[in-house]
From Swiss-Prot:
It comes from Cupriavidus necator (strain ATCC 17699 / DSM 428 / KCTC 22496 / NCIMB 10442 / H16 / Stanier 337). Keywords: Cytoplasm, Glycolysis, Lyase, Magnesium, Metal-binding, Secreted. This is Enolase. Belongs to the enolase family. Its cofactor is Mg(2+). The keyword Metal-binding applies. Binds a second Mg(2+) ion via substrate during catalysis. GO terms for cellular component: cell surface; extracellular region; phosphopyruvate hydratase complex. Mg(2+) binds at D242, E287, D314. The active site is at E205, K339. SUPFAM superfamilies: Enolase C-terminal domain-like, Enolase N-terminal domain-like.
Amino acid sequence: MSAIVDIIGREVLDSRGNPTVECDVLLESGVMGRAAVPSGASTGSREAIELRDGDKSRYLGKGVLKAVEHINTEISEAIMGLDASEQAFLDRTLIDLDGTENKGRLGANAMLAVSMAVAKAAAEEAGLPLYRYFGGSGAMQLPVPMMNIVNGGAHANNSLDIQEFMIMPVSQTSFREALRCGAEIFHALKKILADKGMSTAVGDEGGFAPNFSSNEECLNTVVQAIEKAGYRAGEDVLLALDCAASEFYHEGEGVYQLEGEGLKLSSTQFADYLANLCDKFPIVSIEDGMAEGDWDGWKTLTEKLGTRVQLVGDDLFVTNTKILKEGIEKGIGNSILIKINQIGTLTETFAAIEMAKRAGYTAVISHRSGETEDSTIADIAVGTNAGQIKTGSLSRSDRMAKYNQLLRIEEDLGDIASYPGKGAFYNLR
């Protein structure tokens, strides 16, 4: 038995200089698991609650000492002596201890830090790499990366309404080559922007945040960068968008306001706007193409694009099986973004991935805009054979930590490692 003998929570800083929660779990054998949790910028209204102190005299009210205290007192008392290899039981213990629907009492940040640290300790105890501990002998597929190379919306101070413009290398036969492709395009784009006298400063997730006049101008420039790097857009590399449409949806009026382009569009018009972009550019994936509360708009978008474009629900589904189940039954979207801190435990995270796959939906494992050096999501992506990962651009070490971990995993897998390429979009025609 891998008995838990000590649990230590602490306040550390994330990639934006904001406090977050880190946890160490020590087992009887002497092995330790350590995990730090991420934090989002654009968040879904139904996400599990991230507990912040609200004390304006510390970190502008963003301290997490209450969450840390919960780890070091209540949570510690509840799981001390339990078997770390019983992940589902441990997570259920945390959920019952919290006792709320949204984890608002103990805080999803406290609960997730413990859940992840327990899994890491148990993997160490078992002598297994984390991805293998999660997925067993069947874990062998590396994910296609969604690389956010241009930031707009809530992730940047520019006139782009769409939050993320991403590239997805798909013609390569290994993750290593896909990563090289992405890096070369990133540097080609930097040169193009510099030559145009545009900003090459990077945003929260490592992408550039220049002041393009329209979404189309941005997409044209990304295609130019792909070609400048020696790749073919639509063949070697596909494009993906994260609209984060909830951020510019005006519920009272029922319109999507693209301020950068001076447009006010109904749900149907915005679906047409996105379809037009997909006709002009090799876009394979659109995340949060409608607002989280606009289910009629989501239905329209799914009927219009759902057979040829991956339509990913992030704010829509918030990694929650109850909401995902409703979406599946209503034919909303065809993919779910998986963010571990939206739901707050690993067991619930894996349940959402499993439900999506059973329904023929894809699952994209994702970082948050406020990240740490913790690379657990890389192991989750391989351990669940998810096929796709979204973990930022080709700069900032908080993003590189995940890519570098995937390189190590691919090396560890050796000849049995596979890279799905276009096969990651198994539900598109």
